From Swiss-Prot:
Homotrimer. GO terms for biological process: lipid A biosynthetic process. This is UDP-3-O-acylglucosamine N-acyltransferase 2. Catalyzes the N-acylation of UDP-3-O-acylglucosamine using 3-hydroxyacyl-ACP as the acyl donor. Is involved in the biosynthesis of lipid A, a phosphorylated glycolipid that anchors the lipopolysaccharide to the outer membrane of the cell. NCBIfam families: lipid_A_lpxD, PRK00892.1. Its EC number is 2.3.1.191. Belongs to the transferase hexapeptide repeat family. LpxD subfamily. The gene is lpxD2. Disulfide bonds: none annotated.
Length: 343
Protein backbone atom coordinates (compact mmCIF):
# COMPACT_ATOMS: atom_id res chain seq x y z
CA UNK A 1 0.00 0.00 0.00
CA UNK A 2 1.01 3.62 -0.41
CA UNK A 3 3.18 5.45 2.13
CA UNK A 4 0.94 8.16 3.57
CA UNK A 5 3.65 9.82 5.67
CA UNK A 6 4.14 12.67 3.21
CA UNK A 7 0.96 12.81 1.12
CA UNK A 8 -2.44 11.53 2.18
CA UNK A 9 -4.66 10.54 -0.75
CA UNK A 10 -8.08 11.94 -1.52
CA UNK A 11 -11.00 9.58 -1.94
CA UNK A 12 -12.12 6.90 -1.58
CA UNK A 13 -13.60 6.60 -5.08
CA UNK A 14 -16.05 4.12 -6.53
CA UNK A 15 -15.12 2.33 -9.72
CA UNK A 16 -17.65 4.08 -11.92
CA UNK A 17 -16.11 7.40 -10.80
CA UNK A 18 -12.60 6.23 -11.67
CA UNK A 19 -13.80 4.99 -15.05
CA UNK A 20 -15.20 8.45 -15.79
CA UNK A 21 -12.04 10.21 -14.58
CA UNK A 22 -9.71 8.03 -16.66
CA UNK A 23 -11.82 7.33 -19.74
CA UNK A 24 -11.47 3.60 -19.08
CA UNK A 25 -14.19 1.00 -19.59
CA UNK A 26 -15.34 -1.17 -16.70
CA UNK A 27 -14.90 -4.72 -17.98
CA UNK A 28 -18.28 -6.45 -18.36
CA UNK A 29 -19.76 -3.67 -16.24
CA UNK A 30 -18.73 -5.43 -13.05
CA UNK A 31 -17.94 -3.69 -9.76
CA UNK A 32 -19.37 -0.23 -10.45
CA UNK A 33 -19.84 0.55 -6.76
CA UNK A 34 -16.69 -1.13 -5.48
CA UNK A 35 -14.67 1.35 -3.42
CA UNK A 36 -10.99 2.07 -4.04
CA UNK A 37 -9.06 3.74 -1.22
CA UNK A 38 -5.56 4.03 -2.68
CA UNK A 39 -2.98 3.17 -5.33
CA UNK A 40 -0.25 0.58 -4.94
CA UNK A 41 2.32 -1.64 -6.62
CA UNK A 42 1.15 -5.12 -7.55
CA UNK A 43 3.38 -6.71 -4.92
CA UNK A 44 2.29 -4.41 -2.08
CA UNK A 45 -1.41 -3.85 -2.70
CA UNK A 46 -4.25 -4.54 -0.30
CA UNK A 47 -7.75 -5.53 -1.37
CA UNK A 48 -8.99 -1.94 -1.69
CA UNK A 49 -5.99 -0.64 -3.63
CA UNK A 50 -5.91 -0.09 -7.37
CA UNK A 51 -2.99 -1.47 -9.39
CA UNK A 52 -1.88 -1.26 -13.03
CA UNK A 53 -0.64 -3.72 -15.63
CA UNK A 54 0.94 -2.28 -18.78
CA UNK A 55 3.85 -4.67 -19.38
CA UNK A 56 3.73 -8.44 -19.85
CA UNK A 57 6.65 -9.01 -17.48
CA UNK A 58 4.35 -8.19 -14.54
CA UNK A 59 1.68 -10.79 -15.40
CA UNK A 60 2.96 -13.19 -12.73
CA UNK A 61 2.65 -10.49 -10.06
CA UNK A 62 -0.87 -9.71 -11.26
CA UNK A 63 -1.93 -13.29 -10.61
CA UNK A 64 -0.70 -13.10 -7.01
CA UNK A 65 -1.64 -9.54 -6.03
CA UNK A 66 -4.15 -8.90 -3.24
CA UNK A 67 -5.68 -5.98 -5.17
CA UNK A 68 -9.26 -6.35 -6.41
CA UNK A 69 -8.99 -3.66 -9.12
CA UNK A 70 -6.55 -3.23 -11.99
CA UNK A 71 -6.11 -0.71 -14.80
CA UNK A 72 -5.18 -2.87 -17.73
CA UNK A 73 -4.64 -2.83 -21.50
CA UNK A 74 -7.05 -4.80 -23.73
CA UNK A 75 -4.34 -7.32 -24.66
CA UNK A 76 -3.73 -8.25 -21.02
CA UNK A 77 -7.33 -8.82 -19.88
CA UNK A 78 -6.92 -12.56 -20.45
CA UNK A 79 -4.21 -12.72 -17.75
CA UNK A 80 -6.34 -11.18 -14.98
CA UNK A 81 -7.85 -13.35 -12.22
CA UNK A 82 -11.60 -13.93 -12.62
CA UNK A 83 -12.30 -12.27 -9.28
CA UNK A 84 -10.61 -8.99 -10.27
CA UNK A 85 -12.47 -5.89 -11.43
CA UNK A 86 -10.84 -4.37 -14.52
CA UNK A 87 -10.64 -0.83 -15.86
CA UNK A 88 -9.69 -1.37 -19.50
CA UNK A 89 -7.89 1.39 -21.40
CA UNK A 90 -5.75 1.34 -24.58
CA UNK A 91 -3.16 3.42 -22.71
CA UNK A 92 -3.28 2.12 -19.12
CA UNK A 93 -0.34 4.29 -18.05
CA UNK A 94 -2.25 7.42 -19.09
CA UNK A 95 -5.36 6.18 -17.29
CA UNK A 96 -3.29 5.54 -14.17
CA UNK A 97 -1.88 9.08 -14.36
CA UNK A 98 -5.36 10.61 -14.52
CA UNK A 99 -6.55 8.52 -11.58
CA UNK A 100 -3.41 9.36 -9.60
CA UNK A 101 -4.16 13.06 -10.16
CA UNK A 102 -7.58 12.50 -8.59
CA UNK A 103 -6.07 10.75 -5.56
CA UNK A 104 -3.24 13.28 -5.23
CA UNK A 105 -4.45 16.66 -6.54
CA UNK A 106 -2.00 19.53 -6.69
CA UNK A 107 -1.91 21.51 -3.47
CA UNK A 108 -3.14 25.08 -3.70
CA UNK A 109 -1.80 26.99 -0.68
CA UNK A 110 -3.81 29.99 0.51
CA UNK A 111 -2.62 33.45 -0.40
CA UNK A 112 0.31 34.51 1.77
CA UNK A 113 3.27 36.87 1.55
CA UNK A 114 6.02 36.28 4.11
CA UNK A 115 7.30 39.28 6.00
CA UNK A 116 10.85 38.28 5.08
CA UNK A 117 10.11 38.30 1.34
CA UNK A 118 11.47 41.34 -0.51
CA UNK A 119 9.15 42.66 -3.21
CA UNK A 120 10.05 45.80 -5.15
CA UNK A 121 7.31 48.42 -5.25
CA UNK A 122 6.94 48.27 -9.04
CA UNK A 123 6.26 44.51 -9.05
CA UNK A 124 2.70 43.35 -9.73
CA UNK A 125 1.53 40.27 -7.83
CA UNK A 126 -1.73 38.51 -8.76
CA UNK A 127 -4.45 37.37 -6.38
CA UNK A 128 -4.05 34.41 -3.99
CA UNK A 129 -0.29 34.11 -4.50
CA UNK A 130 1.97 32.46 -1.95
CA UNK A 131 5.37 34.17 -1.58
CA UNK A 132 7.61 32.25 0.82
CA UNK A 133 10.29 33.45 3.22
CA UNK A 134 13.42 34.94 1.68
CA UNK A 135 12.01 35.27 -1.83
CA UNK A 136 13.02 38.30 -3.90
CA UNK A 137 10.71 39.81 -6.53
CA UNK A 138 12.43 42.43 -8.69
CA UNK A 139 11.41 45.66 -10.37
CA UNK A 140 8.53 45.54 -12.89
CA UNK A 141 8.02 41.82 -12.37
CA UNK A 142 4.53 40.55 -13.21
CA UNK A 143 3.27 37.42 -11.46
CA UNK A 144 -0.15 36.01 -12.32
CA UNK A 145 -2.85 34.67 -10.06
CA UNK A 146 -2.54 31.70 -7.69
CA UNK A 147 1.22 31.30 -8.06
CA UNK A 148 3.56 29.90 -5.44
CA UNK A 149 7.09 31.28 -5.12
CA UNK A 150 9.32 29.14 -2.91
CA UNK A 151 11.82 29.90 -0.16
CA UNK A 152 14.87 31.96 -1.23
CA UNK A 153 13.78 32.11 -4.86
CA UNK A 154 15.00 35.03 -6.98
CA UNK A 155 12.77 36.59 -9.65
CA UNK A 156 14.78 39.20 -11.54
CA UNK A 157 13.67 42.53 -12.98
CA UNK A 158 10.98 42.55 -15.73
CA UNK A 159 10.32 38.79 -15.56
CA UNK A 160 6.73 37.81 -16.38
CA UNK A 161 5.10 34.69 -14.88
CA UNK A 162 1.59 33.53 -15.80
CA UNK A 163 -1.22 32.10 -13.69
CA UNK A 164 -1.13 28.95 -11.52
CA UNK A 165 2.64 28.50 -11.60
CA UNK A 166 4.70 26.68 -8.99
CA UNK A 167 8.25 27.99 -8.59
CA UNK A 168 9.94 25.92 -5.91
CA UNK A 169 12.73 26.82 -3.46
CA UNK A 170 16.12 28.28 -4.43
CA UNK A 171 15.22 28.93 -8.06
CA UNK A 172 16.61 31.90 -9.98
CA UNK A 173 14.79 33.39 -12.97
CA UNK A 174 16.08 36.27 -15.08
CA UNK A 175 15.18 37.69 -18.50
CA UNK A 176 12.24 35.34 -18.90
CA UNK A 177 8.59 35.24 -19.92
CA UNK A 178 6.81 32.20 -18.47
CA UNK A 179 3.32 30.97 -19.36
CA UNK A 180 0.52 29.46 -17.28
CA UNK A 181 0.59 26.23 -15.24
CA UNK A 182 4.37 25.98 -15.28
CA UNK A 183 6.24 24.01 -12.62
CA UNK A 184 9.91 24.79 -11.95
CA UNK A 185 11.58 22.55 -9.38
CA UNK A 186 14.18 23.47 -6.78
CA UNK A 187 17.56 24.74 -7.84
CA UNK A 188 16.70 25.47 -11.47
CA UNK A 189 18.49 28.38 -13.13
CA UNK A 190 16.72 30.20 -15.93
CA UNK A 191 17.88 33.18 -17.97
CA UNK A 192 21.57 33.47 -17.12
CA UNK A 193 24.06 34.26 -19.90
CA UNK A 194 24.97 31.43 -22.23
CA UNK A 195 28.40 30.01 -22.97
CA UNK A 196 29.35 32.41 -25.73
CA UNK A 197 32.75 33.91 -26.47
CA UNK A 198 35.25 34.54 -29.26
CA UNK A 199 38.86 33.41 -28.85
CA UNK A 200 42.31 34.12 -30.17
CA UNK A 201 45.87 33.56 -28.96
CA UNK A 202 45.49 36.31 -26.36
CA UNK A 203 42.38 35.00 -24.63
CA UNK A 204 38.61 34.68 -24.69
CA UNK A 205 36.22 37.56 -25.40
CA UNK A 206 32.71 37.38 -24.00
CA UNK A 207 29.78 37.83 -26.35
CA UNK A 208 27.13 39.80 -24.44
CA UNK A 209 23.68 38.22 -24.28
CA UNK A 210 20.67 40.42 -25.03
CA UNK A 211 17.97 37.80 -25.57
CA UNK A 212 15.69 36.09 -23.11
CA UNK A 213 13.95 32.81 -22.32
CA UNK A 214 10.38 32.16 -23.44
CA UNK A 215 8.60 29.27 -21.71
CA UNK A 216 5.11 28.22 -22.85
CA UNK A 217 2.13 26.85 -20.95
CA UNK A 218 1.99 23.58 -18.98
CA UNK A 219 5.76 23.07 -18.92
CA UNK A 220 7.71 21.27 -16.18
CA UNK A 221 11.39 22.00 -15.54
CA UNK A 222 13.32 19.66 -13.26
CA UNK A 223 15.58 20.36 -10.31
CA UNK A 224 18.98 21.91 -11.06
CA UNK A 225 18.19 22.31 -14.74
CA UNK A 226 19.79 25.31 -16.46
CA UNK A 227 18.28 27.23 -19.38
CA UNK A 228 20.51 29.96 -20.83
CA UNK A 229 19.10 33.17 -22.25
CA UNK A 230 19.53 33.85 -25.94
CA UNK A 231 22.39 35.91 -27.29
CA UNK A 232 20.49 38.01 -29.84
CA UNK A 233 17.43 35.78 -30.25
CA UNK A 234 15.45 34.06 -27.47
CA UNK A 235 15.75 30.56 -26.06
CA UNK A 236 12.29 28.99 -26.44
CA UNK A 237 10.59 26.10 -24.63
CA UNK A 238 7.14 25.54 -26.16
CA UNK A 239 3.94 24.28 -24.50
CA UNK A 240 3.69 20.89 -22.78
CA UNK A 241 7.44 20.21 -22.68
CA UNK A 242 8.92 18.11 -19.88
CA UNK A 243 12.52 18.67 -18.81
CA UNK A 244 13.94 16.30 -16.21
CA UNK A 245 16.55 17.15 -13.55
CA UNK A 246 20.05 18.28 -14.50
CA UNK A 247 19.28 19.25 -18.09
CA UNK A 248 21.39 21.93 -19.82
CA UNK A 249 19.80 24.08 -22.54
CA UNK A 250 22.20 26.38 -24.37
CA UNK A 251 21.50 29.84 -25.73
CA UNK A 252 19.07 30.27 -28.65
CA UNK A 253 17.86 26.65 -28.45
CA UNK A 254 14.27 26.05 -29.59
CA UNK A 255 12.36 23.08 -28.13
CA UNK A 256 9.10 22.17 -29.84
CA UNK A 257 5.74 21.51 -28.24
CA UNK A 258 5.38 18.34 -26.18
CA UNK A 259 9.04 17.36 -26.25
CA UNK A 260 10.56 15.29 -23.44
CA UNK A 261 14.17 15.63 -22.25
CA UNK A 262 15.35 13.08 -19.69
CA UNK A 263 17.99 13.69 -17.00
CA UNK A 264 21.46 14.93 -17.94
CA UNK A 265 20.60 15.86 -21.51
CA UNK A 266 22.78 18.65 -22.85
CA UNK A 267 21.91 20.74 -25.91
CA UNK A 268 24.43 23.21 -27.30
CA UNK A 269 23.48 26.63 -28.62
CA UNK A 270 21.10 27.33 -31.52
CA UNK A 271 19.92 23.75 -32.00
CA UNK A 272 16.21 23.35 -32.80
CA UNK A 273 13.95 20.47 -31.78
CA UNK A 274 10.61 19.90 -33.48
CA UNK A 275 7.41 18.95 -31.71
CA UNK A 276 7.22 15.77 -29.62
CA UNK A 277 10.92 14.98 -29.73
CA UNK A 278 12.27 12.60 -27.07
CA UNK A 279 15.87 12.79 -25.87
CA UNK A 280 16.64 9.97 -23.43
CA UNK A 281 19.04 10.24 -20.49
CA UNK A 282 22.53 11.69 -21.04
CA UNK A 283 21.98 12.52 -24.70
CA UNK A 284 24.34 15.19 -25.98
CA UNK A 285 23.55 17.38 -29.00
CA UNK A 286 26.04 19.75 -30.61
CA UNK A 287 25.01 23.25 -31.66
CA UNK A 288 23.23 24.53 -34.77
CA UNK A 289 21.44 21.24 -35.57
CA UNK A 290 17.80 20.45 -36.35
CA UNK A 291 16.04 17.44 -34.84
CA UNK A 292 12.75 16.79 -36.60
CA UNK A 293 9.24 16.31 -35.29
CA UNK A 294 8.65 13.07 -33.41
CA UNK A 295 12.29 11.97 -33.47
CA UNK A 296 13.70 9.83 -30.64
CA UNK A 297 17.33 9.76 -29.49
CA UNK A 298 18.22 6.80 -27.27
CA UNK A 299 20.10 7.11 -23.96
CA UNK A 300 23.71 8.33 -23.95
CA UNK A 301 23.73 8.96 -27.70
CA UNK A 302 25.79 11.84 -29.08
CA UNK A 303 24.22 13.73 -31.96
CA UNK A 304 26.54 15.41 -34.47
CA UNK A 305 24.23 15.85 -37.46
CA UNK A 306 20.59 16.66 -38.18
CA UNK A 307 17.95 14.05 -37.35
CA UNK A 308 14.93 13.71 -39.65
CA UNK A 309 11.34 13.76 -38.42
CA UNK A 310 10.26 10.44 -36.96
CA UNK A 311 13.75 8.91 -36.97
CA UNK A 312 15.05 6.85 -34.04
CA UNK A 313 18.80 7.10 -33.50
CA UNK A 314 21.35 5.88 -30.97
CA UNK A 315 25.06 5.39 -30.41
CA UNK A 316 28.17 7.57 -30.52
CA UNK A 317 28.01 9.14 -33.02
CA UNK A 318 24.26 8.73 -33.31
CA UNK A 319 23.04 6.72 -36.31
CA UNK A 320 19.81 4.92 -37.13
CA UNK A 321 18.86 2.17 -34.68
CA UNK A 322 19.33 -0.52 -37.33
CA UNK A 323 22.84 0.73 -38.17
CA UNK A 324 23.73 1.00 -34.48
CA UNK A 325 22.65 -2.58 -33.88
CA UNK A 326 24.73 -3.72 -36.86
CA UNK A 327 27.77 -1.92 -35.42
CA UNK A 328 27.31 -3.60 -32.05
CA UNK A 329 26.94 -7.04 -33.61
CA UNK A 330 30.05 -6.48 -35.74
CA UNK A 331 32.11 -5.42 -32.72
CA UNK A 332 30.97 -8.45 -30.72
CA UNK A 333 31.91 -10.74 -33.61
CA UNK A 334 35.28 -9.03 -34.06
CA UNK A 335 36.11 -9.33 -30.37
CA UNK A 336 35.13 -13.00 -30.23
CA UNK A 337 37.24 -13.83 -33.28
CA UNK A 338 40.12 -11.66 -31.95
CA UNK A 339 40.24 -9.78 -35.22
CA UNK A 340 40.47 -6.03 -35.59
CA UNK A 341 37.91 -4.28 -37.80
CA UNK A 342 39.27 -3.46 -41.25
CA UNK A 343 40.11 0.18 -41.79
Amino acid sequence: MSNYQFTKPAGPFRLFELAKISGATLYEGKGETFTVSGLAKLSEATSNDLVMLHQKKYVKELKHTAARVCIIGPDYVKYAPDSMYLLVHPNPYKAFALIAQAFYPSEKPPGFIATSAMIESSAIIGVDCFIAHGAYIGNQVKIGNRCKIGVNTYIGDTVTIGDDCLIEDNVSIRHAVIGNNVVIYSGARIGQDGFGFASDANGHYKIPHAGGVIIGNDVEIGANTCIDRGSLDNTVIEDWCRLDNLVQIGHNVKIGKGSVLVAQVGIAGSTELGEHVTLAGQVGVIGHLKIGKGATVLASAKVYKNVKSGDRVGGHPAVSISDWQKQIRFLKTAIKSKKSPKS
